[in-house]
């Protein structure tokens, strides 16, 4: 997944939740991927919708304290995460969404639309639908059984 230092990777909720949750089956691959990206100073674009979805998922799974701590780390000045507003991408994402299977969320379509805009195929996430659509995702744990 290493590219040039300047080429970003786009964050998805699946990767962020795995990164934060040490009991997640994909915690180790997410941690290793984040470390490799940090070593080469590769930015991780954090769509605002992904931040909201991540905080909501973590709040339900692990409690609001964990969710707020994660949000603080993601938004920390100097982190490798760069928060971007997603409104400019919404209409194109909705257009993409209408042709997707029910397994693909609007947030997934926003992530893919932003990846296209940044001219990258790399997604910091584990969802199979990214690979199915021609993007590169983090390789999931061999113990992980994903849903289609």
Question: Can you annotate each of these PLM segments?
Answer:
Residues 1-6, 112, 117-148:
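Acidic, PIN/NYN-like endoribonuclease modules and their adjacent C-terminal/linker elements
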